[in-house]
UniProtKB/Swiss-Prot annotation:
It is found in: Mitochondrion membrane. This is ATP synthase protein 8. It is a single-pass membrane protein. The gene is MT-ATP8. The lineage of its organism: Eukaryota, Metazoa, Chordata, Craniata, Vertebrata. The modification N6-succinyllysine is found at residue 54. Belongs to the ATPase protein 8 family. F-type ATPases have 2 components, CF(1) - the catalytic core - and CF(0) - the membrane proton channel. Component of an ATP synthase complex composed of ATP5PB, ATP5MC1, ATP5F1E, ATP5PD, ATP5ME, ATP5PF, ATP5MF, MT-ATP6, MT-ATP8, ATP5F1A, ATP5F1B, ATP5F1D, ATP5F1C, ATP5PO, ATP5MG, ATP5MK and ATP5MJ. Interacts with PRICKLE3. GO terms for cellular component: mitochondrial membrane; proton-transporting ATP synthase complex.
Amino acid sequence: MPQLDTSTWFITIISMILALFMLFQSKIANHSYYSNPSHKDMKPTTHSTPWEKKWTKIYLPLSLPLH
């Protein structure tokens, strides 16, 4: 069984890490960030649903046992 030649693994791994580093640096450098992000006023919205104004069984108190 032939021996696995691992002599080129070091330079391959180092060059791969360097290439990935350069790729991510160029992606981050081209990304535009907002210089001063401002807070957007969020007003709470109220939804009018038909079951809010109705008296349904789920809103009734626990009923007493029948006598």
